[in-house]
């Protein structure tokens, strides 16, 4: 995906013009210095050329966006059907309402992927792009918070365990996720027909807030869960957060949070990159981290399916069946 652009080559006219201007200033200010090496002058002129990076997610990456979106929608829809299917064993999964919300978040992300994909025309409005980024990050923030609650509360999230707990968490988590998306919604728009984040001095506060939100949700939250798990185990204070296969979700977003933080430091000139190669490496990491984050909408339904399969196979013999399930099983037993 993408076409790599190497260091810009100066045209003969540009090179001659630059050389003439440089020599005029040098001669008038310091006099002619015949000992100035030609090689050093060429190296300095080459170093002053613009630094171009390889954009992996350009127009040629459109098939990747479309395929990921289609697969994500199909996989999320299948998981939602299984979770809401009457008298299906996946409804016995601990905290299945939270799992259903994870599938909804993954489906929302999958739907909005084509909106932000390059190569789908040049008439997209800033409002559509802002809405796309709002759903993009809002669904991701909500999924991360849902995973944190599912790991911390575990079996107490089951239907009927704590009255009103699931509803309260649902409203709170999606409300917080919506608030966290306000900075990126206001700092995004359309430029040259592409949806992009707008970097400017006026929007620097919004960009900083968005970066902090990504670092907190995608980087610090999983680190906090791992830390709490290890600390409680070391101190003998109980099992700690419930570790399961769903934690693999953070693998897809953790690099995005880290690289986004580095990019903000570079743009704010708090971290200086001395070479063009370092800037190209950072741009490449940004593209790779974004591509990995996009793939989560396909991986999340698979993780949910694997978790529900493992949980029901392990917990089904020890879980009390709801009344509807008991009568259904009794009917099946009498028929046999």
From Swiss-Prot:
PANTHER family: ATYPICAL CHEMOKINE RECEPTOR 1 (PTHR14181:SF1), DUFFY ANTIGEN/CHEMOKINE RECEPTOR (PTHR14181)
InterPro entries: Duffy_chemokine_rcpt
Membrane topology listed for this record: Multi-pass membrane protein
Entry GO MF terms: C-C chemokine binding; G protein-coupled receptor activity; signaling receptor activity; transmembrane signaling receptor activity
Gene coding for it: ACKR1
Consequence the record notes for mutating residue 15 to A: Does not affect interaction with Plasmodium vivax Duffy receptor (PVDR)
Region (Mediates Plasmodium vivax Duffy receptor (PVDR) binding): 1-30
Listed result of changing residue 20 to A: Significantly reduces binding with Plasmodium vivax Duffy receptor (PVDR)
GO CC entries: early endosome; plasma membrane; recycling endosome
Reported modifications of this chain: Sulfation at Tyr-41 facilitates interaction with MGSA/CXCL1, RANTES/CCL5 and MCP-1/CCL2 but not IL8/CXCL8. Sulfation at Tyr-30 facilitates interaction with IL8/CXCL8.
Identification of the protein by name: Atypical chemokine receptor 1
Transmembrane segments: 64-84, 96-116, 130-153, 167-187, 208-228, 245-265, 288-308
Glycosylated position list: 16, 33
Species of the source: Homo sapiens
Example of a GO biological process term: regulation of chemokine production
Family affiliation: Belongs to the G-protein coupled receptor 1 family. Atypical chemokine receptor subfamily.
Tissue: Found in adult kidney, adult spleen, bone marrow and fetal liver. In particular, it is expressed along postcapillary venules throughout the body, except in the adult liver. Erythroid cells and postcapillary venule endothelium are the principle tissues expressing duffy. Fy(-A-B) individuals do not express duffy in the bone marrow, however they do, in postcapillary venule endothelium.
């Amino acid at each position: 995906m993408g076409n790599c652009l190497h260091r810009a080559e100066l045209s003969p006219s540009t090179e001659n013009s630059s050389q003439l201007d440089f020599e005029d200033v040098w001669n008038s200010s310091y006099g002619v210095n015949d000992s100035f090496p030609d090689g050093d002058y060429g190296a300095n002129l080459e170093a002053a050329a613009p630094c171009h990076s390889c954009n992996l997610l350009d127009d040629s990456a459109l098939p990747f966006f479309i395929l990921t979106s289609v697969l994500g929608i199909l996989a999320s829809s299948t998981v939602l059907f299984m979770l809401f299917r009457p008298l299906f064993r996946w409804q016995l999964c601990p905290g299945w309402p939270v799992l259903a919300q994870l599938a909804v978040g993954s489906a929302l992300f999958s739907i909005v992927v084509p909106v932000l994909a390059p190569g789908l025309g040049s008439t997209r409005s800033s409002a559509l792009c802002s809405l796309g980024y709002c759903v993009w990050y809002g669904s991701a923030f909500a999924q991360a918070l849902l995973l944190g609650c599912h790991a911390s509360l575990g079996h107490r999230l089951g239907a009927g365990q704590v009255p009103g707990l699931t509803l309260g968490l649902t409203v709170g988590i999606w409300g917080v996720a919506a608030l966290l998306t306000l900075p990126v919604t206001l700092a995004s728009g359309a430029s040259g027909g592409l949806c992009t984040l707008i970097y400017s001095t006026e929007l620097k506060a919004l960009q900083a807030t968005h970066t902090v939100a990504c670092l907190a949700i995608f980087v610090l939250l999983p680190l906090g869960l791992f830390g709490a798990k290890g600390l409680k185990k070391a101190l003998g204070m109980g099992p700690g957060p419930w570790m399961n296969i769903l934690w693999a979700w953070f693998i897809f977003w953790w690099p995005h949070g880290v690289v986004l933080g580095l990019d903000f430091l570079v743009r704010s000139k708090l971290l200086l990159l001395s070479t063009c190669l370092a800037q190209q490496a950072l741009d490449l990491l940004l593209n790779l981290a974004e591509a990995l984050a996009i793939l989560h909408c396909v991986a999340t339904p698979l993780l949910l399916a694997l978790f529900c399969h493992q949980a029901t196979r392990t917990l089904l013999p020890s879980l009390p069946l709801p009344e509807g399930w008991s009568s259904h099983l009794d009917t099946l037993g009498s028929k046999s």
